[in-house]
A protein has these predicted regions:
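General helical secondary-structure elements
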Residues: 59, 108, 117, 139, ...
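A short beta-sheet element
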Residues: 41-105, 112-124
Length: 174
């Protein structure tokens, strides 16, 4: 069912009951080109760090700027101060389900700024989220991962085919 419309009538919880929001911090003190952890801004990966703030299997959402573009992180990461880390309580909610909920949720409705879109932790914690049985969430996650792997293989195959065509055209010019 649609996680926003909740047409299945699942129990509704506030975010404050099913996840932890991790505030980002300035990365200057932990930044290191050979660091073990990725640094994420609201637009994606921006560097490496020696420390982490957000645990693996979490979701990132922009606090300022790109507020409607969630990201999944499967490893521990450092999030900068323009990004919130969402760490789901894994006894209640699967991170894939949380990610897709965030993809469909309109964070613009919580926007408090006029020029640069901006979200507050207090408003986010009050978001209602339908909670399907964890077993269904996990089945959904398994399907999504299988689809993503298939998509990746198909893209690699297309890329290989395209590269082969380019090489053939180049060799035909000689």
């Amino acid at each position: 069912g649609n996680p926003i419309k909740n047409d299945k009538g699942w129990k509704i919880e506030k975010w404050e009951n099913v996840l932890k929001i991790v505030n980002g911090k300035n990365q200057k003190k932990v930044e290191n080109k050979t660091g073990k952890y990725d640094i994420f801004g609201s637009g994606g990966k921006i560097g490496k760090a020696d420390d982490w703030l957000v645990k693996e299997n979490s979701v990132l959402i922009g606090r300022k700027g790109s507020i409607n573009k969630p990201l999944i992180v499967k490893e521990k990461i450092w999030n900068v101060d323009t990004v919130f880390g969402l760490e789901p309580d894994t006894d209640i909610i699967n991170y894939h389900y949380l990610y897709y909920f965030c993809c469909f949720y309109n964070f613009e409705q919580l926007n408090r700024a006029v020029t640069i879109p901006s979200l507050t932790k207090r408003d986010l914690l009050k978001i209602d989220i339908p909670i399907p049985p964890l077993e269904l969430q996990n089945k959904f996650a398994t399907r999504i991962e299988a689809i993503q792997k298939l998509k990746f293989r198909k893209l690699k195959s297309l890329e290989k085919t395209e590269n082969s065509k380019i090489i053939q055209k180049f060799l035909a010019l000689k």
